[in-house]
């Protein structure tokens, strides 16, 4: 505790007070002179003064020496966010921050749970011009130097990697293929790099490029010594298939690479594809690799955080940059005249390709834009080649091809030069033989042909299928059919015996008029317009079509050209001029022939108006009951010459219907492998179903029950829709007359004549289009308010008594049932074209046949099976079995793949014990739990309880058939 008596100041003050008291006493005389006390009393103040002086001096000294400094404070340093969160493939969620006191910004890794804040900033680079996007749920892997594809190369601008590309061949040139926005932008490329080494870019030529955002590519001619120095090898560009497993590569340098895997998907537009591989800054132009090669090139994002976009490299290389006229068939892309673009209901994109010109790109079509801005087919007749002239009974072309420079003799009912050679090649020996059959469609043997085909034996069911039957009992219902002329004849007699000729319905004209309103008008082939055709112009167009991607190169050319080559490819390679001349001459004959209705099928062949139709058994698994019965599926192979005749007459019309499938009743252009196409179809059916409940009809042996009046109705509608002139209309009518009056040929050369008009020939170019329109016409005739058809498959508005009405039209309807709905009457599921279609998914219903064929092939291509069956609810167990029991080199990393579109097991189906093998259609859970309802007045009402007791359209009276 503090005590004041212990303080020096207190003691000094006390001593001075005492001394002051003593001095006061001295002053008042209290002490005697000579006493020492006054001296001591004076000394104390003096010492005190000295002490004070010394203390003050000390204070001054310390004061002067003490430095006054600014107050020290704790400095608060903080950083301000300069960007929204973005995604880095190696580090995760990142942000840019700048310090409050100034200075360079820093990159900070933030909490991964903040992924929800990414939003639109999934674009990797963070700036608005970025083309790159991460894909949520995807992963990246580090790639060791040297493990990347040998064709991959990095494109540098100084130390920064601005893109990637690959070495490949474009139209025969060895080149670099990359994105145009990588090669031609503000950051000029300075070097190509591979495995940590780089070579400076010089003034290399870029002969082909396109700067359109949707078709972003450039072709760079890189010297071979550069490729050699870098150790870069060429890769091939391959046609993408839907759901290809693909990989993309990228990174900050060529020896610090990451890879991202995903699935490649085709879209409606063939020049474009989408993929789910994640990308990062500087990945533009990177090749999209599948196990087969490069399927595309990454150019940007399609849907931020979900899907990226690529250019279909195979399409660009083989359709837009190819200098040869012949186009590959893989993508089923066709070139159309520029004037036909305006007949399509969807938008084409217009692109300019440096080194090729301007083009319009559609879904599965493209057209080159004429440089003059005017299509040459729009020229006046005076500017077209002169028409042929008749001189002394001979038709002469003033500018004929060298191979037909001589005047061609065209006497009435005769043949021209090339067709005469064709007939001589066939070696027909026509003779009137005995009747082959008098039941249904009467048939008669009429001779032999010198054009014969190999007689093959039936294929045995392999052990692989027998073993799989223990796991998939559905496979036991299939086997391979018999082959050869004996099987062909037996099946022909069975099929034709079911033909039931009928009269023309009284309401046919009105039904045709109603149907015409649902189809678009088309334009005919430009060289067949007007009444004066140019032989040279027709011949030139035939040559183009013969070399187009539309022709199946692997198919047989039919009778009699199979004597020259076994495939269309080999035939056209060696004898293009002969084929084109035969087609051209036949077109002119068809446009002039009269009174063909009085001619027999043999007479039509003799006159050179058509060729025999070859019959053969289709090599696909057949139901065992059909094999036991000997009722095999026959293909009616129409000759290549007749196919090209049909393409010339009806090609533009059929192509328009394919392009417009979403807007017309006929669906030959439909492709259910794409999710958006299946959804578009189901949405359309749901709307139609709300008008009149949907029903599925199964017509037995449709091709063999087609009536002549149905074929005549189709060709007359074609003439109206195409605006055919008189000459073209006559050619079309005569072609159909030949079409419905055929001579069939078996593999051993036996010729058989049909003696009544009718029957659809399955190998015709018009089969899908004509069958679809006839099928819609049938629905119109029985009173269905709507119908869609793909060949003989249909979904239509319900009609009571439909089976009997179809029978009166000559068609046996073995099954007619309403489509599955929910308890509220909403459309739930349809089966169409062997596919089960629902609102959010679609899968192949005939998977047992596909699996049987796959296991029987002996060549294990897992990707083919996956492409066809992966959307089925049975795919997980199929994949599990195939991966473990077949020796395919293509099955890698399959067990851990994430489910594909439609792959997840359908819980609705499983919960109800639905088996496709049993043939019972699946219904919704709501239907399964539906309580027993009151009696209904008709079958339709019992299936659509939401419509009430009476159901929709109960009367069923939709037009007279007699």
From Swiss-Prot:
Active site: 181 (for protease activity), 216 (for protease activity), 284 (for protease activity)
Transmembrane regions listed in the UniProt entry: 10-30, 36-56, 74-96
Marked site positions, Cleavage: 132-133, 325-326, 402-403
SUPFAM superfamilies per the UniProt record, alphabetical: DNA/RNA polymerases, Trypsin-like serine proteases
GO molecular function, one term: serine-type endopeptidase activity
Entry PTM: The polyprotein is proteolytically cleaved into several chains by the viral protease.
EC number: 3.4.21.-, 2.7.7.48
InterPro entries with a match to the protein in the record: DNA/RNA_pol_sf, Peptidase_S1_PA, Peptidase_S1_PA_chymotrypsin, Peptidase_S39B_luteovirus, RNA-dir_pol_luteovirus
Keywords, sorted A to Z: Covalent protein-RNA linkage, Host membrane, Hydrolase, Membrane, Nucleotide-binding, Nucleotidyltransferase, Protease, RNA-directed RNA polymerase, Serine protease, Transferase, Transmembrane, Transmembrane helix, Viral RNA replication
Keyword DNA-binding: no
Gene Ontology biological process terms in this record: DNA-templated transcription; proteolysis; viral translational frameshifting
Reactions catalysed: RNA(n) + a ribonucleoside 5'-triphosphate = RNA(n+1) + diphosphate
Domain RdRp catalytic: 692-806
Domain annotation Peptidase S39: ranges: 135-335
One GO location term (cellular component): host cell membrane
Name of the molecule in the record: Replicase polyprotein P2AB
Taxonomic classification: Viruses, Riboviria, Orthornavirae, Pisuviricota, Pisoniviricetes
């Amino acid at each position: 505790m503090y005590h004041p008596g212990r303080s020096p100041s207190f003691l000094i003050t006390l001593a001075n007070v005492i001394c002051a008291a003593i001095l006061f006493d001295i002053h008042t005389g209290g002490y005697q002179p000579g006493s020492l006390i006054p001296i001591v009393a004076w000394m104390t103040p003096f010492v005190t003064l000295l002490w004070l002086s010394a203390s003050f001096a000390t204070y001054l000294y310390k004061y002067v020496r003490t430095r006054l400094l600014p107050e020290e404070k704790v400095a608060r340093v903080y950083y301000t966010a300069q960007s929204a969160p973005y995604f880095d493939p190696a580090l995760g969620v990142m942000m840019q921050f700048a310090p409050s006191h100034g200075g360079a910004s820093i990159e900070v890794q933030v909490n991964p749970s903040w992924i929800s804040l990414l939003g639109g900033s999934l674009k990797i680079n963070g700036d608005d011009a970025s083309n790159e996007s991460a894909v949520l749920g995807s992963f990246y892997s580090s790639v060791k130097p040297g493990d990347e594809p040998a064709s991959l190369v990095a494109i540098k601008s100084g130390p920064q990697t601005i893109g990637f590309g690959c070495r490949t061949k474009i139209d025969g040139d060895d080149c670099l293929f990359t994105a145009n926005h990588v090669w031609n932008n503000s950051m000029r490329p300075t070097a190509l790099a591979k495995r940590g080494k780089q070579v400076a870019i010089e003034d290399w030529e870029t002969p082909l490029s396109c700067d359109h955002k949707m078709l972003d590519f450039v072709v760079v001619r890189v010297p071979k010594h550069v490729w050699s120095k870098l150790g870069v090898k060429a890769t091939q560009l391959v046609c993408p298939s839907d759901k290809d497993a693909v990989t993309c590569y990228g990174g900050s340098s060529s020896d610090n690479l990451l890879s991202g895997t995903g699935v490649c998907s085709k879209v409606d537009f063939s020049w474009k594809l989408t993929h789910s591989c994640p990308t990062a800054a500087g990945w533009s132009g990177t090749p999209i690799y599948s196990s087969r090669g490069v399927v595309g090139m990454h150019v940007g994002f399609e849907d931020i955080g979900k899907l990226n976009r690529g250019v279909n490299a195979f399409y660009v290389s083989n359709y837009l940059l190819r200098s040869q006229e012949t186009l590959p068939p893989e993508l089923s892309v066709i070139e159309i005249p520029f004037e036909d673009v305006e007949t399509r209901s969807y938008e084409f994109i217009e692109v300019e390709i440096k080194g090729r010109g301007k083009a319009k790109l559609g879904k599965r079509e493209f057209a080159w834009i004429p440089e003059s801005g005017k299509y040459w087919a729009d020229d006046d007749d005076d500017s077209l080649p002169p028409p042929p002239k008749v001189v002394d009974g001979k038709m002469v072309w003033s500018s004929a091809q060298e191979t037909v420079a001589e005047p061609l003799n065209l006497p009435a009912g005769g043949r021209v030069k090339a067709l005469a050679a064709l007939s001589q090649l066939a070696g027909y020996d026509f003779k009137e033989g005995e009747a082959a059959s008098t039941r249904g469609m009467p048939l008669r043997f009429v001779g032999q042909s010198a054009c014969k085909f190999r007689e093959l034996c039936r294929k045995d069911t392999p052990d692989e299928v027998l073993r799989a039957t223990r796991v998939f009992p559905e496979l036991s219902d299939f086997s391979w059919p018999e082959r050869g002329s004996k099987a062909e004849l037996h099946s022909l007699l069975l099929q034709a015996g079911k033909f039931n000729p009928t009269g023309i319905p009284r309401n046919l004209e009105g039904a045709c008029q109603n149907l015409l309103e649902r189809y678009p008008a088309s334009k005919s082939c430009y060289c067949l317009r007007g009444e004066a055709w140019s032989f040279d112009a027709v011949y030139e167009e035939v040559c183009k079509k013969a070399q187009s991607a539309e022709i199946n190169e692997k198919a047989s050319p039919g009778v009699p050209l199979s004597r020259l080559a076994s495939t269309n490819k080999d035939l056209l390679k060696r004898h293009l001029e002969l084929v084109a001349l035969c087609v051209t001459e036949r077109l002119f004959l068809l446009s002039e022939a009269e009174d063909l209705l009085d001619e027999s099928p043999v007479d039509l062949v003799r006159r050179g108006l058509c060729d025999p139709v070859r019959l053969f058994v289709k090599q696909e698994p057949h139901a065992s009951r059909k094999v036991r019965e000997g009722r095999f599926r026959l293909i009616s192979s129409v000759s290549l010459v007749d196919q090209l005749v049909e393409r010339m007459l009806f090609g533009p019309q059929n192509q328009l219907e394919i392009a417009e499938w979403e807007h017309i009743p006929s669906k030959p252009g439909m492709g259910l492998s794409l999710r958006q196409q299946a959804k578009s179809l189901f949405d359309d059916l749901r709307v139609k179903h709300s008008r009149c409940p949907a029903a599925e009809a199964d017509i037995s042996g449709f091709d063999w029950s087609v009536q002549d009046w149905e074929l005549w109705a189709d060709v007359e509608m074609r003439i109206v829709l195409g605006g055919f002139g008189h000459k073209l209309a006559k050619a079309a009518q005569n072609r159909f007359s030949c079409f419905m009056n055929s001579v069939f040929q078996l593999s051993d050369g036996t010729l058989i004549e049909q003696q009544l008009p009718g029957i659809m020939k399955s190998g015709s170019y018009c089969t899908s289009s004509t069958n679809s329109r006839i099928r819609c016409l049938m629905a119109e005739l029985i009173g269905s308010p709507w119908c869609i058809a793909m060949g003989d498959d249909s979904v239509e508005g319900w009609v009571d008594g439909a089976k009997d009405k179809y029978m009166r039209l000559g068609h046996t309807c073995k099954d007619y049932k309403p489509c599955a709905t929910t308890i509220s009457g909403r459309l739930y599921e349809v089966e169409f074209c062997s596919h089960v279609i629902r609102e959010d998914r679609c899968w192949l219903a005939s998977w047992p046949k596909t699996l049987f064929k796959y296991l029987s092939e002996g060549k294990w291509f897992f990707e083919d099976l996956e492409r066809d069956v992966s959307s089925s609810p049975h795919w997980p167990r199929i994949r599990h079995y195939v991966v473990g029991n077949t020796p395919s080199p293509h099955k890698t990393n399959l067990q851990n793949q994430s489910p594909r579109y439609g792959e997840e097991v359908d819980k609705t189906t499983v919960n109800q014990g639905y088996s496709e093998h049993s043939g019972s259609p699946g219904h919704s859970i709501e239907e399964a739990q539906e309580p027993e309802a009151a009696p209904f007045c008709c079958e339709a009402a019992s299936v659509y309880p939401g419509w009430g007791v009476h159901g929709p359209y109960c009367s069923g009276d939709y037009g007279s058939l007699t």
